[in-house]
Amino acid sequence: SIYGHVLNGLNTGKANIAKALLFHSCQNPLSDKAISKDDAQYIGFGLPNPNLREVLFCDRSAVTLIFDTEIQVGTYLSIDNFPYPKPLFKNGKWHGEIMMTLLYNPPLDANFGQEYCRTNVDVSLGVYKYNAKGEIEFKGQVPLDVKWEEKYERERVENGFKWCPIKSYYRKIKQGIEGVSWRLYIDCTTRSNAFIQRQPFTLIITIKDPSGKEDIYSEVISQLRERGFTFNDLQVQERIRNLYGIA
């Protein structure tokens, strides 16, 4: 299976990373466009990419960041001044193609019927920008911020991926967006009477230069080093690297 090849290709042997990579690679079998909300009802997140090289590696015009960690329930994780590629800032606006996949295994309890998933993890990648009053505020871009009212909980579940243990988002910024800097925000909530302390999760973010010209990978790696982030390359089996001629 494709999943087996991905899992066996990783030195870590972490099933959740392999699963997340598989979903992250999914493509629309109906066209080369992103999967719409309506299509998703019939084809889910699409078909996994059978090309192992494209699943495990990326070109210089793109960078993929994998966060495999855990979050304390009732709190949030935030990376301010997120290292968004500077070459994608042109004429005062941010551009780029963004794919984001979030996967976690929530505690399940059949005693609660349709509410059997007991935790929900949300993620937002967005920008800090000035509002009309000249105040700085955060605006989610992937996914786009939506002001859900409590009475529309069903709508949020159906269209906002709430309580879904796999969330997949895509956006191609064509017109550009204004913003001072980027921020990654993750939070975790539970249903009532769910006594859970921590929720492990895997988050994958890919940022591409749509033109394929800019060296996005090296630029983001440089930002990570400058800001003191601790990170490692994805550990791929040596035989896989040799197979595709990747050092």
Across the structure, where does each feature detected by a protein language model lie?
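Hydrolase catalytic cores
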Residues: 1-32
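Flexible domain-boundary/linker segments
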Residues: 23, 35-39, 117
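Activation corresponds to long, low-complexity, non-globular regions
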Residues: 29-47, 231-238, 242-247
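Secreted peptidase-domain scaffold signal
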Residues: 41-129
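Intrinsically disordered low-complexity regions specifically enriched for long asparagine
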Residues: 107, 162-165, 208
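C-terminal edge strands of extracellular/lumenal beta-sandwich accessory domains
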Residues: 116-131, 173-247
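Extended, solvent-exposed segments with strong compositional bias
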Residues: 134-179
